[in-house]
UniProtKB/Swiss-Prot annotation:
InterPro entries from the UniProt entry: Keratin (IPR003461)
Family the entry assigns: Belongs to the avian keratin family.
Subunit structure: The avian keratins (F-ker, S-ker, C-ker and B-ker) are a complex mixture of very similar polypeptides.
Modified residues (N-acetylserine): 1
Keyword list, A-Z: Acetylation, Keratin
Acetylation recorded as keyword: yes
Protein name stated in the entry: Feather keratin B-4
GO cellular component: intermediate filament
A GO term, aspect molecular function: structural constituent of cytoskeleton
């Protein structure tokens, strides 16, 4: 035999080498990779408000037609709070 033991792992000089194969497994290298912190930004909720118009005391023709369609009699020149009487159910009018 050429050598009883294989040469150490790594580059070796070519001097004093022979042609007999020598297989040696070096110990495994261990590398610890720690993940870097990741910051994730989540968008917050979008809050929007729309003010609602109040129909009390309005003289608009559109409001008048809505009220007359729902069975509340109004005069052509507008209406006051007395026009609701006992028929006002407390429902909100559509904008």
């Amino acid at each position: 035999s050429c050598y009883d033991l294989c040469r150490p792992c790594g580059p070796t000089p070519l001097a004093n080498s022979c042609n007999e194969p020598c297989v040696r497994q070096c110990q495994d290298s261990r590398v610890v990779i720690q993940p870097s912190p990741v910051v994730v930004t989540l968008p917050g909720p979008i809050l929007s408000s729309f003010p609602q118009n109040t129909a009390v005391g309005s003289t608009s023709a559109a409001v008048g037609s809505i009220l007359s369609e729902e069975g509340v009699p109004i005069s052509s020149g507008g209406f006051g709070l007395s026009g609701f009487g006992g028929r006002y159910s407390g429902r909100c009018l559509p904008c």
